[in-house]
Amino acid sequence: IDKSKPIVYLLPTNSVTDQLALRMSTKALGLPSPTETLTLAGREYSSTLFLRKTQPLFRSSAKDTGIEDVFTDLFHLHRDHENLDLQVVPVYVTWGRAPGRGKPGLSDLIADKAAPSWLRKLFIVLFLGRDNFINYSKAVSARAMSNQHGSDQSIAHKLVRVASTHFQRKRQSMTGPTLLERQELNNSVLGSDAVRRAIAEESRSKKVSHEKAKETAQTYITEIAADYREGLIRFGDRLLTRIWNKIYNGISVGHADRIRELAANGHEIIYVPCHRSHMDYLLLTYVIYHEGMVTPHIAAGINLNFWPVGKMFRRGGAFFLRRSFAGNKLYTAVFREYLELLFNKGYSVKYYPEGGRSRTGRLIPPKTGMLAMTIQAMLKGVNRPVSIVPVYIGYENVMEVKSYLNELKGSKKKKESNLQVFSAIRKLKNYGHGYVNFGEPIALNQFLENHVPNWRDCRDAEPEKKPAWLTPAVNELANNVMTRINRAAALNGMALASLCLLSSKRQTMSEAELKQAMGDFMDLFKAVPFSDDATIPDSSAEELLRDTLKLGRFDVKEDDYGRLISPQPKSAVYLTYYRNNILHLFAIPGLIMASIFAKKGTTKNSIFQLIAALYPLLQKELFLHLTQDEALAHTDALITALLNKGLLRQESDELLPPDAHCKQFHSAWLLSRCMQETLQRYAVVLTILDKEKVISRSALERESKQVAERLSALYGLSSPEFYDKNVLSSFISALKENHWLDSEKDGSLKYSEECEALRADVMALIWPEMMQHLENVTLNASN
């Protein structure tokens, strides 16, 4: 909205309370008042226009506002006065978010439906006055419309029609579709062809009556389905606002305009966030609600369906799914039909592609079941365009981090219970900042067109028959989702300080060194952004460090030379979780500096060769979004920035570490060490392959884990994922996929000449003492 140009506000109805709310809002925002008279070319107009009047109390239809004539007159003014440019700003004012029900009831009396009568509006404001939301849409230039479409009445009619559709979509995006009654839901799911066939199959295979099989299906839909209550959402909003104010210093939201635009264009929105904590369920829903969007139906693990939390989650829009559908065709059919019903009715949905919470802080390889069911729903025909929205969620303090690390060390996962809930509430404290970044949406229709041009032909195929292209397409989609999540990463103080301290030799740094390093790294990412979607704090390094120290994760000791900062006793291992949240941002700069420090200087071409060799492996492990060519171009840009920032120096063709007396030297040294554990893990696997030459995958994973555990004990590595079997398995898969390994007829893995060259590159980058120990450990193991 350009405040220097005249503005007219366009509202759906001429409600007095809406106008009063708008007046208060414009005053707070410094915008022109909607009650002022607007003078254009010597003529006076109202600053507020309405599509229709409110519903009369005793008549079925409202009177016309004559808005088409007003717009026609305004367009004529623009035709006659070339310098005139009026901005039309659509404003949607809502009270509450009740979507209404299929069967009208008393609650509908206060549902803010289109053009309510003054009496209904009185009740609405009386009961929902605190739940007022005012949404300003992008200003529309009357000059641009007049120049492009002319100035006759047909254009005014078109503008009114488009505005009416816009407000309908705006309402839909804020309240969602009308809620299904339980009986209607049951009839829709249990009466579908797929579920009827599954019931018949259950009856035959289990040798039970048709009624018994149908009762089982009824039990499943009762177990699965959400029971959305808008009143609980409003109550939760007030409660969570108090909790967030208590435990968070703020919540940063990035790129929310993307989801608002999708909703305005009538898209079915599927949110696919990373999963760090149980807090994700609440935080993302809270953010979406405060962005003026309807809260989604959320896929939650059946482990959360315990009294009373399960009932509260269900009323907040959660639907529950089992960890495995294997072997239960009836459950699969019921769940799939319920999910398709949500899509077809227009409910936004949220599910976690990782399947569970990350215990290491890095993204987990995705579980593809929900994505596969989403595509299968597309095959059956979803009426609206479907967009998948990856979401990055980050915290400066995760309440479960201690239990995560215990699980990584072998402890059994504790079952969720009321005791855990009350314990978590009791421990609520300063959790720093929360971050929610909406990544680049994936238009599912377009994705299928690009990868499977004939996908629509499968709509007439048998519903239970899986197309041959489905699995590859789902795997590609899943990888796309994960890379877009990481692409939208949020750099924060806790993660940055953790990365610096864990990269230092004794996990202790002076305050000046830590501040310098944090500032240097932020400057580097500002000069060469990791992506357009990644966010960097606006704070200075000094402010960021000060706020980070308040989180209570660090010891600060002071001597005659200044303050020393280190992790609290035995808590360095916790910092690995926060470091891993952002480690993928440092993959390429870390490799560049590791090569330069290890070789005490190298050429740009040598660095390019190293990146070309290692990037495909890092890309799979860390879900990096750049292609190989883009990674090399990014490397070139980073080298230039590192030189400009004093983190590198150049002599002739050789790139060298900065001079030891330079203030940036310590930052450069830390950067060279931040990828060491990853490289050391690679070295473990490659050295075992070198010694064995041919080895089964299971034996390779087992021996790699044993050697990594030993090295971790020898060097005091504080990172449980260093020997995590899933991380090791992911690296071995990447070696196979990139043809570094050959396969024998029995499936064993064979060390190749190409793999030997890769091992040489990796071994040149790890610490010499680590390389020596690694050689000795594997040699002793083979003897």
Regions found by a protein language model. Give the residues of each.
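Membrane-interfacial terminal anchoring regions of lipid-handling membrane enzymes
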Residues: 1-783
